[in-house]
Amino acid sequence: MKWDWIFFDADETLFTFDSFTGLQRMFLDYSVTFTAEDFQDYQAVNKPLWVDYQNGAITSLQLQHGRFESWAERLNVEPGKLNEAFINAMAEICTPLPGAVSLLNAIRGNAKIGIITNGFSALQQVRLERTGLRDYFDLLVISEEVGVAKPNKKIFDYALEQAGNPDRSRVLMVGDTAESDILGGINAGLATCWLNAHHREQPEGIAPTWTVSSLHELEQLLCKH
């Protein structure tokens, strides 16, 4: 294995992130049956907020509260309380993706392993502990704590500084979102691997080093490279 460091995104790269199920579970505590239509309405608000967050236009707190503002008004609850309940629900239901544990075992001892995530601090540590994967990772970099999000090159520069400034030609970034994980890795001068499990069309102007459809495929690839 030619890599000194392999960095992963977290959500939908190493861990499942079924936000619909998490929201359904969370809203049960408020006697609300959260429907597919409700989820569509939620995503219509949530997705643009994530784009704004990744572009540095809003803070993590504005994102976390903004996505629940309409529900907070309906339920007469603080949006921060709904957000906290959602994160707790997600921590309970998140599991490693198929092939994640096998892949981490294959890498461990051959390269150092890190996470660079745009997710939020409250979820990351709890999820790593609950899934039993905490000890696999040498470094955990969370955008909320750094103050910038992928694809901003600064979060990658920060991660590499924390990693001891390894040779960037010997660092690989793996993620499922081309517009943040892969573009950011490219901007930082890293090799990249796009986990494209849903066979999305490759965005124009973003050219990953490799593209795989599963973590099993990535493990096989790393055995050769």
From Swiss-Prot:
It catalyses: a ribonucleoside 5'-phosphate + H2O = a ribonucleoside + phosphate; a 2'-deoxyribonucleoside 5'-phosphate + H2O = a 2'-deoxyribonucleoside + phosphate; UMP + H2O = uridine + phosphate; dUMP + H2O = 2'-deoxyuridine + phosphate. Pfam families: Hydrolase. It is found in: Cytoplasm. Optimum pH is 7.5. In contrast to nucleotidases from other families, is not inhibited by ribo- and deoxyribonucleoside di- and triphosphates. One of its GO terms (biological process) is pyrimidine nucleobase salvage. GO terms for molecular function: 5'-deoxynucleotidase activity; 5'-nucleotidase activity; manganese ion binding; nucleotide binding; phosphatase activity; thymidylate 5'-phosphatase activity. Its cofactor is Mn(2+); Mg(2+); Co(2+). Belongs to the HAD-like hydrolase superfamily. YjjG family. Nucleotidase that shows high phosphatase activity toward non-canonical pyrimidine nucleotides and three canonical nucleoside 5'-monophosphates (UMP, dUMP, and dTMP), and very low activity against TDP, IMP, UDP, GMP, dGMP, AMP, dAMP, and 6-phosphogluconate. This is Pyrimidine 5'-nucleotidase YjjG. The gene is yjjG.
